[in-house]
Design a protein with these regions (language model features):
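Bacterial N-terminal signal peptides that target proteins for export
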Residues: 1-9
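C-terminal motif of bacterial Sec signal peptides marking the signal peptidase cleavage site
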Residues: 16-19
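Bacterial Sec signal peptide processing site at the extreme N-terminus
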Residues: 21-26
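Terminal, regulation- and interaction-focused segments at domain boundaries
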Residues: 27-41
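Short beta-strand-to-loop capping motifs
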Residues: 34-36, 83-86
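Short amphipathic alpha-helical segments
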Residues: 40-65
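An amphipathic, aromatic/His-enriched active-site/gating alpha helix that lines ligand/cofactor pockets
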Residues: 58-65, 85-129
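Short beta-strand micro-motifs enriched in acidic
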Residues: 70-74
């Protein structure tokens, strides 16, 4: 009996540790699209080739990871596609926090004039149009 308990005890301890482990936040994927003004493309690319450290820090502080922006020309029009993963627990609150950051606001004043919102976003006073995920392979 003593030998059985000695063999089972470490397993029980492992199960307790696994059960008490802090759960990792669920990651939510987001993607958007917008137009890019051809005469502002070089400026936009230069800004993102040399992002401001405070802006990158704010993005990370707001639980954003694996953030990327891609550019594509389609029929003579430039488009931007943005993708990110959100690992926080309150996306709206984090976005409000980011929007209240003076350095981020200053950054957006540099990048927004480079972009050309699609009609649905423009109608809402937004820059980026939401997209719908149609496939994901974890």
């Amino acid at each position: 009996m003593k030998k059985i308990i000695q063999n089972i005890l470490p397993l029980l301890g492992l199960f307790v540790l696994i059960g008490c482990a802090t759960p990792q936040p669920q990651v939510t994927r987001y993607a958007w699209v917008t137009g890019l003004k051809p005469d502002k493309a070089e400026r936009y690319e230069d800004l993102h080739a040399h992002p401001w450290p405070a802006v990158n820090q704010m993005i990370k502080a707001c639980h954003i990871q694996n953030f990327s922006i891609h550019e594509r020309e389609i029929n003579g029009q430039l488009y931007l596609f943005a993708y990110l993963e959100y690992a926080g627990t309150n996306f709206d609150a984090d976005m409000k926090h980011m929007a209240a950051d003076p350095e981020t606001v200053r950054w957006w004043k540099e990048t927004d004039p480079c972009q050309s919102p699609l009609p649905d976003a423009a109608a809402k006073g937004k820059i980026w149009s939401d997209t719908k995920e149609v496939y994901f392979l974890p």
